[in-house]
């Protein structure tokens, strides 16, 4: 068997039609937010480890560089440094927080511990004009998060703004700019204006990163890479794999064979919807495999969430290998991997400073003896970008607006061993949650809402009889890109209806709890 060969060409959707910037990640908790704000301005960007070599980036032809914040102090011996190519490139540079201090330190300024640390809201006052602050008032609110500060500017730099505790809240020398505050967070209300000023006025970028331009470029790159070979696609029916299927089918037609594997781990009615949309509506040569018993046997006795993910990923690939042998040859395996999947898995392409959170079965959970090359045309996209592309490709709204669903399915919404009984419980509870949230008209404002079966029993009283039954947790969150999420403040009467229906309509459940934890510290899924 050949080794796993990740996709290359179509992972980086770049061409002269896309202006781009590079974000060097120094470990900031806000690094992904910088990328989101840049994409919101319709400029393509990639977030890469701070020590990435220029040779790995020059294909992007970036028009600017952003240095993220980070937890280190620039004067420490082992602190992350500025790659020499950044200044040698002659490109505009925007340093944020640690990035600003790194610019100052590298170019001859002085950075020292602040006498008074700044964490939280602050007001900065402009003291000089610069394109980065075009259209901003003399004083504006920002978000600070730093324990060091610049005590002396590097030669040739001028101070642009100051705050009560930071005499150099912003600095610049021509196209080299530093901001001590964080323009990427919502607590800096005018931060998007500042970032757009950098992108458009300083870097000279054009807002050409759109769904239309991406689709045009992706189709061209898929055709170039695939040639006359055939592609096998893992179709789950979720937004990601559905958009990947529609995009690849638009590019190469029936060279694509979408495979839907009914693992028995899907939501109620999901298998029927997939067959209807892709088999009959899009007229794709859909191959449907009933593997429910196969996956249940593989998961028997397994409770560890990482082991579940790996076993499911391995079994998926074995199914695809069997299809490839019977209907092949296929050279490529296509997946709907997104940028947050890559970042959370700390897979190749994600920041080296990011700790591994969990294995996504379509990233780190794949066996290393995979017999295909991976084709992942959405690998550098966020969820909202994928939805926009799905609409452009003509996917029905019921697919485009479908809430995210984990690759391992309900297996990671059952804490503990996956059994037929547990699946029946969580599937029915999840259906009730979806029905009630949608009936309340709240689904469009939520990122995800679902039920989780907990590995505990609870004492209760039902029909004058003592019960000792299972517990369901309800999870509902708001988010824009899954990188951060807040628990949803659902109305109490809705929560009451959910609890009442679940304990009365789902056999084996006598208690319902509501998860009020945000991300971070928790992840959206429980496993």
From Swiss-Prot:
Pathway: Purine metabolism; GMP biosynthesis; GMP from XMP (L-Gln route): step 1/1. Residues 209-402 form the GMPS ATP-PPase domain. Its EC number is 6.3.5.2. PROSITE patterns: GATASE_TYPE_1, GMPS_ATP_PPASE. It catalyses: XMP + L-glutamine + ATP + H2O = GMP + L-glutamate + AMP + diphosphate + 2 H(+). ATP binds at residues 236-242. One of its GO terms (molecular function) is GMP synthase activity. InterPro entries: Class_I_gatase-like (IPR029062), GATASE (IPR017926), GMP_synth_C (IPR001674), GMP_synth_GATase (IPR004739), GMP_synthase (IPR022955), GMPS_ATP_PPase_dom (IPR025777), NAD/GMP_synthase (IPR022310), Rossmann-like_a/b/a_fold (IPR014729). It holds the Pfam family GATase. The active site is at residues 97, 182, 184. Keywords: ATP-binding, Glutamine amidotransferase, GMP biosynthesis, Ligase, Nucleotide-binding, Purine biosynthesis. GO terms for cellular component: cytosol. Residues 20-208 form the Glutamine amidotransferase type-1 domain. Homodimer. PANTHER family: GMP SYNTHASE [GLUTAMINE-HYDROLYZING] (PTHR11922:SF2), GMP SYNTHASE-RELATED (PTHR11922). Catalyzes the synthesis of GMP from XMP. This is GMP synthase [glutamine-hydrolyzing].
């Amino acid at each position: 068997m050949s080794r796993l060969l990740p996709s290359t060409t179509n992972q980086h959707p770049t061409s002269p039609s896309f202006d781009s910037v590079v974000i060097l990640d120094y470990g900031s908790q806000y690094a992904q937010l910088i990328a989101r704000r840049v994409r919101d301005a319709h400029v393509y960007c990639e977030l890469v480890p701070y020590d990435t070599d220029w040779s790995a980036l020059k294909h992007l032809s970036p028009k600017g560089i952003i240095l993220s914040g980070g937890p280190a102090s620039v004067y420490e011996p082992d602190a992350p440094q500025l790659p020499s190519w950044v200044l040698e490139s002659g490109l505009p540079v925007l340093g944020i927080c640690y990035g600003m201090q790194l610019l100052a330190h590298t170019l001859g300024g002085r950075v020292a511990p602040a006498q008074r640390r700044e964490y939280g809201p602050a007001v900065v006052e402009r003291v000089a004009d610069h394109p980065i602050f075009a259209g901003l008032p003399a004083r504006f609110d920002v978000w600070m998060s730093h324990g060091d500060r610049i005590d002396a500017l590097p030669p040739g730099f001028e101070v642009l703004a100051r705050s009560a505790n930071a005499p150099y809240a912003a600095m610049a020398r021509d196209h080299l700019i530093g901001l001590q505050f964080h323009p990427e967070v919502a607590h800096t209300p005018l931060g998007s204006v500042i970032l757009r000023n950098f992108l458009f006025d300083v870097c000279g970028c054009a807002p050409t990163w759109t769904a239309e331009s991406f689709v045009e470029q992706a189709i061209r790159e898929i055709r170039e890479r695939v040639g006359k070979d055939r592609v096998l696609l893992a179709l789950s029916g979720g937004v990601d794999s559905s958009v990947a299927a529609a995009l690849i089918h638009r590019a190469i037609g029936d060279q694509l064979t979408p495979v839907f594997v009914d693992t028995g781990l899907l939501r109620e009615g999901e298998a029927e919807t997939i067959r209807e949309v892709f088999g009959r509506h899009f007229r794709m040569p859909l191959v449907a495999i009933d593997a429910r018993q196969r996956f249940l046997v593989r998961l028997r006795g397994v409770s560890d969430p990482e082991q579940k993910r790996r076993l499911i990923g391995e079994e998926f690939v074995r199914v695809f290998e069997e299809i490839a042998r019977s209907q092949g040859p296929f050279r490529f395996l296509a997946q709907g991997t997104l940028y947050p999947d890559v970042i959370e898995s700390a897979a190749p392409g994600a920041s080296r400073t990011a700790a591994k959170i969990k294995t996504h079965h379509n990233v780190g959970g794949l066996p290393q003896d995979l017999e295909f090359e991976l084709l992942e045309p959405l690998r550098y996209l966020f969820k909202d970008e994928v939805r926009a592309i799905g609409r452009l490709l003509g996917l029905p709204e019921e697919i485009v607006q479908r809430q995210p669903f984990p690759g391992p399915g309900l297996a990671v919404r059952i804490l503990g061993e996956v059994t037929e009984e547990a699946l029946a419980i969580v599937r029915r509870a999840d259906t009730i949650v979806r029905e009630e949230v949608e009936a309340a008209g709240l689904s469009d404002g939520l990122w995800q809402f679902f039920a989780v079966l907990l590995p505990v029993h609870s004492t209760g009283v039902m029909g004058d009889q003592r019960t000792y039954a299972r517990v369901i947790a309800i999870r509902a969150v708001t988010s824009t890109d899954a990188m951060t999420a807040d628990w949803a403040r659902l109305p109490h009467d809705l929560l009451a209806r959910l609890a009442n229906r679940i304990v009365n309509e789902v056999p084996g459940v006598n208690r319902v709890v509501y998860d009020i934890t945000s991300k971070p510290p928790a992840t959206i899924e429980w496993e």
